[in-house]
Amino acid sequence: MVKSELLTPRGLRTLAPKNIHYEGTYEGDQATRDHAYHQGTVWPWLIGPYIEANFRLYGKEFVKTAKELLAGFEEDMTVYGVCSVGEIYDGNPPYAPNGCISQAWSVGEILRSMAMIRKYEKAKK
C-alpha cells in the first residue's frame, strides 16, 4: 500500500488519494492550507525511512530503486531552493513545492539515504 498509494517522486503522502479526507494541493488562505497540511501533502523527509525499510527487506537489490527515488529531488534542488528541498509538496502531480523553501530534516534524510546507498553498493552479495 505504501508504494502504490503514498509514494511519489518527492517523498510520501500523508494520506492516500482514495481517502475521502484527501487534499491533493496545498493552496488557498491560511485556514485552507492548515487543513490540507496533513491530509495528503507529500513530506520529503519520509523518503529516508522508506528507503531504509526497503534496504532491510531487499538489501543490495534495492540500490537502483533508491537511486531513482532520490533522482526526483535533483531538479528541485536547483530550482525551488538552491541545494535544498521544500518543506512539503502537493500530493497531486506535478508535486509543486510548498511550505518553507528549505527544510533541514528533509535534506538530512536525503543525505542519509545517499549514505545508505553507498553502504549497500559496497556490501558483498
Where are these regions (language model features)?
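Short linear motifs at secondary-structure transitions and domain/linker junctions
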Residues: 60-62, 87-88
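Extended glycan-interaction surfaces of carbohydrate-active proteins
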Residues: 1-43, 71-125
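Short glycine/serine- and small hydrophobic-enriched flexible loop segments
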Residues: 48-56, 112-116
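Alpha-helical support elements that line or immediately flank enzyme active sites
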Residues: 51-60, 66, 70
